[in-house]
């Protein structure tokens, strides 16, 4: 299992652990416990399966200058040519990266916002939308690919496979590293304690 899940490290270096960082919710204090352990135990809450980190995708051939900050998503220079992910639980994280990069607010923990922070983040998005900043709010992989491929959008929330899909069309597209870092995510597989299993390991009923 990768050290990212076990210790919150990549290549021996600690990574940001705001929100539900895998290593903070991986271990349980006991077999039937509902309390996460602060150090490794023999009881795991799930089996880690996949992780990645997302950032902004850009069309360097159309932007023609360096992009180094999440704040560029709300730069008036790109009015009407930006897009953000429209899956609330993920999109608000991208929005928070933008809010922090613009110096509007510094979050203690983007993954555990206060009500006031949620309100501020949503208010920032609403104002940008009303001002015509966004070409679209996408929630489908293919939609993000089409927006970028067509040139309707030059900078947007993007997943790495979508960037690859745009490149496969012979179109310049960059999965852009930013000073504010990436928005990371992880997933795992777990079985509910209510599941009935027979001696052969098959689910009953």
Report the location of each language-model feature.
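Short beta-strand and adjacent tight-turn residues that come in two discontinuous sequence segments
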Residues: 84, 157-158
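Alpha-to-beta junction loops
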Residues: 78-81, 150-155
């Amino acid at each position: 299992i990768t050290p990212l899940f076990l210790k919150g490290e990549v290549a021996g270096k600690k990574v940001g652990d705001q929100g539900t960082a895998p290593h903070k919710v991986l271990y349980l204090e006991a077999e039937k416990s509902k309390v996460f352990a602060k150090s490794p135990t023999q009881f795991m809450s799930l089996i880690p399966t996949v992780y990645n980190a997302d950032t902004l995708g850009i069309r360097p051939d159309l932007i023609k200058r360096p992009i180094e900050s999440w704040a560029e998503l709300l730069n008036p220079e790109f009015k009407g040519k930006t897009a953000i992910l429209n899956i609330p639980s993920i999109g608000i994280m991208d929005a928070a990266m933008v809010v922090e990069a613009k110096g509007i607010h510094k979050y203690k923990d983007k993954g555990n916002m206060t009500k006031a922070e949620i309100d501020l983040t949503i208010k920032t998005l609403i104002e940008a939308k009303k001002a015509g900043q966004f070409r679209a709010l996408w929630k489908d992989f293919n939609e993000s690919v089409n927006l970028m491929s067509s040139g309707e959008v030059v900078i947007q929330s993007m997943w790495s496979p979508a960037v690859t899909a745009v490149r496969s069309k012979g179109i310049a597209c960059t999965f852009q590293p930013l000073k504010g870092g990436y928005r990371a995510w992880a997933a795992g597989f777990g079985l509910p304690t209510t599941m009935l299993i027979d001696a052969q390991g098959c689910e009953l009923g």
